[in-house]
């Protein structure tokens, strides 16, 4: 055997593309960019995934509905997560082919009592969500998205809020200090350059014209009047609202050759989108039932009723199993899962934190990650050698360009995914995702080739 046959080398995927792949990469990326622009919160993403699913013949499924091979179903979990399935020819007792990704992304949440006036300007108080570099969120245009739930005639009414996504919409901003007066600020540690309590969002400055002698905060009054006219809410209704600010950037091509996509929220919508669309695009009933699980709260620990640690997924699967008179535990122990989450892409601008032999690289394909975690693999699901070999065989057979990845140098830092929560259910699980540059920044970057290979990889996995 030659050295080329004996050595493992991460080669660029461009040398291995078929003509069909070259066309597919560009076409697929266009659909993905549109999805990103619509899906800047998990609520928006669930609505968009459900819309796409229904256009492909999926139906909302409730407990005790009948199931037959080929049925396409979904269930939404509290507006912030969605579970989709294509029922296979084999019994659920023989397991499912499961992909699991998350729809939430780092952002700036509006607090429950947010509105205040100070020195001729109105602001929202915030609490950041997920692991961010706080200084990256100042001096960029922001959108306001979310819902306000108000009580109307004794009933709860949910009102959608979406300001800043249209070209003619106003935007919002967190101000920063001018460099001329930032001498002290620039001496701080990066974690303290902008403090959490300083992430206040500028929302207006024109005082109300309403004659109200009891009101000394006329700008706050003007903002409240506007919110009441537009959404029927009062200040008290912030207590039952979920509002956040996200970057007002649309997804776009990066580079003269348009080989990258730059956008907010690649982590983890760059895995959620191909995990779902590859299920939608199955042309034949698969042997095993294919399940796509898209959850919330991964960025803050996967807790809560919409996170991966909730029982919502177990309940959905138990309902499916009951329809076939199958034990849930039997289904889980015979299932296989791709925990679909991003990994870091090696960045030559920051080589010191990476282990170049093991970290994933842009344009080298879909990345298999045997383990994540930190401090001696703490907080991870370490996939078995047998499972790694099984997924390798699936990808190779389907012509998927793939690579392996890890999360930087040992003891450099670390992170985790939902993999361990699925593995704890006795489901064979391995991480698989798209390498990302500038992860958790307001504007992240991924290679179109890697995105398309994720789509091909998930599809091959469902068909296995």
Give the role of each language-model region.
Residues 1-464:
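N-terminal hydrophobic/helix-forming segments and targeting peptides
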